[in-house]
């Protein structure tokens, strides 16, 4: 059915074309030619010029004529230079490129021969094409704007010129003594305020060179008459004259500084002290203050020191005052003298001054402008050395002052003054000393000295000051301390050591280093030095050597004796190994204090090994308790399983965690000056003593409970001999274990008081022979071990006999092999 419809439709289309064909045939041209084509005949068409089709002759109405792009790259059309080809429908045009125009006047042309294009001068057509500070410059086909010198094109607007800031762009060649001043399109090199051009130099061009104006010598300053003009680079300052100080609220070293006379520092008697001698001294001081003139500062200083020297040489009724009041008077004199000398010394001329007086009082002063060096002041009994930069107060332009006054007579008023030590230093002293004697106070060995600077902020110096004291001989078995006088809130004070350390001491001299300034001295404190007992040393080394041998034999026994290997011997083996390593390291490395890092590592290792030893002691006690409990409750296999899971993580893990925490918190406290062990400062030693006390306490409780269980067991037993003997052996081992593994550490902690020496001997003897006791109890007293020793002994003798027989047999064979000799 579909095929029939298609045939009918095709026949209908043919029928429709027949009239046209008849018409074309009648004219001789095809009516179906496509657009932009021309008829050739009744059956063919051809595209018009400027168009093309798939074939040159079109024979079907389905073909089309398309425009030819004559301006395409492969086209033969050539418009010539300065022109562009423009394609049109069926043709093309040549036009001049932008910026060019034809001379002939025709706007389009067809080929290069008709090309008359030439450049258009846009700058001539529009002279204002470029904006301010720009000049139009014609180019082929276009133009550019060139900026005047000192200007540059703005990137976002190529017709606009903006000013170049030569001062910030680094393009100016101004001399370092000048200041660059930017102008529109240019710059100037001008002298700064307080500067002027050198002779022959202009002021403005780039070759300007300037020099500082000395306002002080030229009279251009405005300093007040109470000040002195000081020229500075590019400016000047006004400083107070010697003996003057800035008025209240007005800073010194400014152009508007105004000064007034510096009055004598107020120095009055201490309140609550009644002494005619002291009153006469302060009357002299008040008279000196009323008559004080800045130009007479040198004389005033000498008069004050003379009066103080006389006061301390003959203190009179001051010696009858209670000790506390004498200390208060001394504190008041030291504090006031420092303030007065600091103020008066600022009025002295630059240089080094030394004063000495009959009773031994000395003053050394150095006044200088600030310099970058160290300063050393020397006296008969003391030397002070410090960095000169410490003397200058920030913002104070005046001269720097360093002073050292030695007052030997002050020791009379400071007799029996208390000494207050820092807690850390107190603990450190107790490590090497028995402690302060109950019936003695510190003895003043050296003169009392007082150091002062023009800078009164000396509580925390950026670099320490060093003192070298000469003093009388030190009594043997005493401790020498570098101290300073710390003023109390009640007007008195005490000796202290905060911020001061003893660098070194000999029989008659001591070097001290402090981070602050005050009044200083050297004390001889009544400490009994803990000298090393040679007998204890011999006992320690001999006992530990024997213990090492016994521990090695015990460890080999626990490893090689198959008959006794169980959970108990595993505990014994780990305990023996830890104790062996700890004792060995103690013997060879406890005194290796020369290298701090190595000593710290040794101390940390000893800490771990002894903690591990203690932990295995605890596991031994726990296992002994569980074994005793097993006498009444049959669960031996569960005890073994429990101990096997527990013992290694606890035995080695707990000490490792403890040492790791200690090392992470305070690693610098591993290693002491005398041995590679834990320092007592800040309670660090309790990282070892704490576990010792805890384990000893737990072991004691377990021991008592074990004895109670054994007591009940013994009372319930019948007369069966073997059971009774085994139970008694267990009780004996329990008692021996407490004595060997717990009692020794308890004795070490109890080395205090009158019985300290006895405890030290007991601790040393028992602890050094600990390995011997372990070998005795766990090896020699064990029947199975003795039997194994017997087997090993027989085997060794048998091997020895066989070796001897083999040797004899070899000798006999050698003799028979020799030829006989006939005489």
Swiss-Prot record:
Residues 562-569, 627-644, 705-735, 782-823 are cytoplasmic. It is a multi-pass membrane protein. Autoproteolytically cleaved into 2 subunits, an extracellular alpha subunit and a seven-transmembrane beta subunit. Keywords: Autocatalytic cleavage, Calcium, Cell adhesion, Cell membrane, Cell projection, Disease variant, Disulfide bond, EGF-like domain, G-protein coupled receptor, Glycoprotein, Inflammatory response, Membrane, Receptor, Repeat, Signal, Transducer, Transmembrane, Transmembrane helix. SUPFAM superfamilies: EGF/Laminin, Growth factor receptor domain. Disulfide bonds join 29-39, 33-45, 47-65, 71-85, 79-94, 96-117, 123-136, 130-145, 147-161, 167-180, 174-189, 191-210, 216-229, 223-238, 240-259, 482-512, 500-514. Residues 25-66, 67-118, 119-162, 163-211, 212-260 form the EGF-like domain. Residues 24-540, 591-605, 666-683, 757-760 are extracellular. The record marks 517-518 as: Cleavage. One of its GO terms (biological process) is G protein-coupled receptor signaling pathway. Glycans are attached at residues 41, 111, 206, 298, 347, 354, 456, 460. The chain crosses the membrane at residues 541-561, 570-590, 606-626, 645-665, 684-704, 736-756, 761-781. Expression is restricted to myeloid cells. Highest expression was found in peripheral blood leukocytes, followed by spleen and lymph nodes, with intermediate to low levels in thymus, bone marrow, fetal liver, placenta, and lung, and no expression in heart, brain, skeletal muscle, kidney, or pancreas. Expression is also detected in monocyte/macrophage and Jurkat cell lines but not in other cell lines tested. High expression in mast cells. Residues 1-23 form the signal peptide. Residues 482-530 are annotated as: GPS. PANTHER family: ADHESION G PROTEIN-COUPLED RECEPTOR E2, ADHESION G-PROTEIN COUPLED RECEPTOR. Has no murine ortholog. The GPS region of the GAIN-B domain is necessary, but not sufficient for receptor cleavage, which require the entire extracellular stalk. Binding to chondroitin sulfate is mediated by the fourth EGF domain. Belongs to the G-protein coupled receptor 2 family. Adhesion G-protein coupled receptor (ADGR) subfamily. Cell surface receptor that binds to the chondroitin sulfate moiety of glycosaminoglycan chains and promotes cell attachment. Promotes granulocyte chemotaxis, degranulation and adhesion. In macrophages, promotes the release of inflammatory cytokines, including IL8 and TNF. Signals probably through G-proteins. Is a regulator of mast cell degranulation. It is linked to Vibratory urticaria: An autosomal dominant disorder characterized by localized hives and systemic manifestations in response to dermal vibration, with coincident degranulation of mast cells and increased histamine levels in serum. This is Adhesion G protein-coupled receptor E2. The gene is ADGRE2.
């Amino acid at each position: 059915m579909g095929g029939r419809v298609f045939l009918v439709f095709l026949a209908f289309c043919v029928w429709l074309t027949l009239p046209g064909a008849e018409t074309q045939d009648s004219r001789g041209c095809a009516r179906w030619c496509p657009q932009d084509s021309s008829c050739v005949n009744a059956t063919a068409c051809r595209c018009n010029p400027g168009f093309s089709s798939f074939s040159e002759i079109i024979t079907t109405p389905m073909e089309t004529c398309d425009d030819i792009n004559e301006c395409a790259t492969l086209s033969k059309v050539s418009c010539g230079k300065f022109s562009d080809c423009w394609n049109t429908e069926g043709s093309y045009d040549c036009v001049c490129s932008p910026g060019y125009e034809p001379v002939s006047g025709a706007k389009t042309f067809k080929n290069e021969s008709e090309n008359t294009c030439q450049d258009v001068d846009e700058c001539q057509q529009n002279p204002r094409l470029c904006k301010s500070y720009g000049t139009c410059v014609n180019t082929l086909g276009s133009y550019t704007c060139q900026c005047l010198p000192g200007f540059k094109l703005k990137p976002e607007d190529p017709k606009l010129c903006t000013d170049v800031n030569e001062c910030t762009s680094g393009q100016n060649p101004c001399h370092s003594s000048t200041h660059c001043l930017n102008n529109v399109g240019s710059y100037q090199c001008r002298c700064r305020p307080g500067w002027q051009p050198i002779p022959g130099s202009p002021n403005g061009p780039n070759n300007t060179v300037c020099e500082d104006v000395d306002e002080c010598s030229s009279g251009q300053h405005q300093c007040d008459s109470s000040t002195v003009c000081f020229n500075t680079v590019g400016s000047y300052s006004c400083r107070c004259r010697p003996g003057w100080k800035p008025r209240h609220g007005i800073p010194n070293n400014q152009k508007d500084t105004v000064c007034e006379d510096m009055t004598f520092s107020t120095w009055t008697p201490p309140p609550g002290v009644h002494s005619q001698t002291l009153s006469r001294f302060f009357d002299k001081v008040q008279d000196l203050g009323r008559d004080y003139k800045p130009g007479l500062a040198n004389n005033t200083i000498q008069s004050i020191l003379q009066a103080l020297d006389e006061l301390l040489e003959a203190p009179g009724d001051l010696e009858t005052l209670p000790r506390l009041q004498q200390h208060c008077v001394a504190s008041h004199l030291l504090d006031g003298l420092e303030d007065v000398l600091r103020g008066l010394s600022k009025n002295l001329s630059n240089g080094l001054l030394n004063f000495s007086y009959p009773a031994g009082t000395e003053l050394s002063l150095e006044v200088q402008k600030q310099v970058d060096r160290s300063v050393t002041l020397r006296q008969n009994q003391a030397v002070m050395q410090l960095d000169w930069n410490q003397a200058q107060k920030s913002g104070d332009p005046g001269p720097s002052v360093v002073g050292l006054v030695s007052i030997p007579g002050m020791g009379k008023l400071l007799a029996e003054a208390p000494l207050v030590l820092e807690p850390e230093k107190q603990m450190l002293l107790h490590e090497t000393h028995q402690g302060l004697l109950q019936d003695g106070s510190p003895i003043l060995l050296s003169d009392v000295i007082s150091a002062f600077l023009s800078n009164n902020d000396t509580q925390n110096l950026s670099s320490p000051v060093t003192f070298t004291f000469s003093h009388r001989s030190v009594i043997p078995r005493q401790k020498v301390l570098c101290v300073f006088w710390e003023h109390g809130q009640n007007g008195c004070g005490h000796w202290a050591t905060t911020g001061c350390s003893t660098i070194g001491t000999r029989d008659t001299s001591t070097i001290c280093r402090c981070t602050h300034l005050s009044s200083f001295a050297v004390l001889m404190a009544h400490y009994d030095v803990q000298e090393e007992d040679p007998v204890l040393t011999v006992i320690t080394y001999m006992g530990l050597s024997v213990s090492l041998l016994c521990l090695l034999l015990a460890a080999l026994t626990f490893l090689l004796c198959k008959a006794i290997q169980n959970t108990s011997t595993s505990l014994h083996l780990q305990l023996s190994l830890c104790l062996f390593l700890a004792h060995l390291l103690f013997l060879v490395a406890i005194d290796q204090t020369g290298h701090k890092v190595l000593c710290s590592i040794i101390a940390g290792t000893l800490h771990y090994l002894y903690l591990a030893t203690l932990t295995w002691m605890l596991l031994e006690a726990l296992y002994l308790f569980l074994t005793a409990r097993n006498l009444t409750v049959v669960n031996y296999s569960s005890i073994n399983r429990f101990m096997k899971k527990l013992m290694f993580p606890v035995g080695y893990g707990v000490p490792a965690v403890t040492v790791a925490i200690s090392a992470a918190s305070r690693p610098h406290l591993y290693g002491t000056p005398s041995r590679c062990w834990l320092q007592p400062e800040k309670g660090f030693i309790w990282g070892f003593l704490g576990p010792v006390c805890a384990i000893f306490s737990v072991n004691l409780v377990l021991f008592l409970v074990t004895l109670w269980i054994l007591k009940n067991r013994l009372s319930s037993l019948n007369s069966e001999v073997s059971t009774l003997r085994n139970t008694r052996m267990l009780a004996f081992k329990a008692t021996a274990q407490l004595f060997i593994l717990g009692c020794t550490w308890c004795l070490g902690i109890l080395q205090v008081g009158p019985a300290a020496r006895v405890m030290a001997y007991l601790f040393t003897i028992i602890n050094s022979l600990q390995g011997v006791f372990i070998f005795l109890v766990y090896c020699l007293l064990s029947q199975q071990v003795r039997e194994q020793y017997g087997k090993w002994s027989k085997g060794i003798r048998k091997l020895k006999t066989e070796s001897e027989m083999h040797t004899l047999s070899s000798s006999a064979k050698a003799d028979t092999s020799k030829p006989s000799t006939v005489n």
